[in-house]
């Protein structure tokens, strides 16, 4: 068994390594505008839409598990068990938790008022804000991309994600899997 020291990278890229094709700069406003239009039309806000997108995001991880593990191995030299435990399983657990609690999170919550405001009533109504940008780092490129995307989707927002260019195989794989499972106008990906 050979070892690898990250401080002294190998002179050749690992097998399966992909060169990242960056999104042309001129295409970025189109991706953001599509996400903004999806949000403005209200397609991201209903409970059913949020659950459907969370299920699709979960399917990215479940259906693409082998591809993601291979990409993590190629870019970061993560053993499969580490990639599964730290990037995939944890994120599936996060999404499952969000799906379990989403209906309750969406309900307005009554809150107490100070005596000076009586006989008034108050409640907290959680509303989405629009388009969320998720920029993922290289060290946990799946977990720190999909987890925040899931949170933004659960909140009812459209999302634009940018995987780390320092993990190009993972970035390309995530882009392909997300495009396969989620509507591009609600969840856009920018590479580079």
Language-model regions, residue ranges each:
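N-terminal Rossmann-like NAD(P)+-binding subdomain of aldehyde/semialdehyde dehydrogenases
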Residues: 2-123
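Rossmann-like NAD(P) dinucleotide-binding subdomain of oxidoreductase/dehydrogenase enzymes
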Residues: 112-192
């Amino acid at each position: 068994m050979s070892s690898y020291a990250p401080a002294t990278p190998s002179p050749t890229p690992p097998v399966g390594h992909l060169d990242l094709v960056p999104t042309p700069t001129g295409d970025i406003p189109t991706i953001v505008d599509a996400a903004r239009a999806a949000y403005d039309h209200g397609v991201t806000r209903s409970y059913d839409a949020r659950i459907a997108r969370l299920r699709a995001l979960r399917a990215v991880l479940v259906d693409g598990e082998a591809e993601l593990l291979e990409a993590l191995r190629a870019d970061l030299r993560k053993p499969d068990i580490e990639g599964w435990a730290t990037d995939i399983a944890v994120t599936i657990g996060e999404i499952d938790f969000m799906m379990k609690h989403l209906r309750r999170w969406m309900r307005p919550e009554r809150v107490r008022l100070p005596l000076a405001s009586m006989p008034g009533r108050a409640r907290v109504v959680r509303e989405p804000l629009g388009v969320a940008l998720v920029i993922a780092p290289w060290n946990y490129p799946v977990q720190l991309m999909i987890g925040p995307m899931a949170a933004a989707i659960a909140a009812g927002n459209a999302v634009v994600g940018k995987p780390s260019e320092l993990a190009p195989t993972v970035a390309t794989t995530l882009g392909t899997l997300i495009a396969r499972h989620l509507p591009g106008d609600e969840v856009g990906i920018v590479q580079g």
